[in-house]
Structures are given as C-alpha cells and as structure tokens.
Amino acid sequence: VSEDPKITLARDSYDALAKGDLDHVRDNLLADEVVFHVPGRGPLAGEYRGKDQVLGYLAKFTEMTDGSVRFEPDSIIPGEDRTVVTVRVQGERAGRQLDDRGVHVFRITDGKISERWSYPQDLYNIDAFFE
C-alpha cells in the first residue's frame, strides 16, 4: 500500500525545514501563489503571499530562534482538498524555551502546498516568545 501523496508532501515539507533546505521547499513543494496564514500579534503574525514572502517568513522564524526551531509532525490526516497535521513546535530564543503543540492545515493543489493555516495550542505563549 503506497502512502497518500498528500501525506508524503506534508512530511517532505517538515523534513526539508528540518534540514534548512528552503530551495527544495521553493522548487518542489510550494505553489506559485501560495499563502500562509499566521495568527497572533507577534512579529511573525500575518499573511504571507507568494513563494518569496512564505520563504521569508520561514527564514525569519529560523533566524529568530537561532536555527533551533523544530517542527515535529505527530499525525498527518489527508482530506479531499485539505490535509491536517498535528505538530509539535520547539525552539529557543534569548534563553527562553518554546514547546507548543498545534495544528497546521494545508490546502494542496496540483501536488503542491497552495495554502497553510497555523493554529497553535497556546497563541499567547507564541506571541510572548517572539516579542
């Protein structure tokens, strides 16, 4: 039994981020008109449109955690046009620890990530961590 391609795509995105391989993310995983929705009031919150903005967000997230950020997917549940991932996010910044669980919802179009919504378990903690 082969793995659902939506699961493979989601897993590949987390693997590429873990390796810092943003070129692979850009060239193979993101749709041209990709949109990331990031909740909150912190410096990373907002809506990122297009590959350049999304990759800028991912690079800034990594930079603000001194490269310590880790996204560990617990489960990946494919749907018809959305794929849901329960994920643990960990990192360190200025001596503070981040350890949060949340949900990422991906819209996958033509085999690429076209949209992602982030739903952290503790949004207040995420905002405080990045202040």
Label each region the model flagged.
Residues V1-E131:
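C-terminal and inter-domain tail/linker signature
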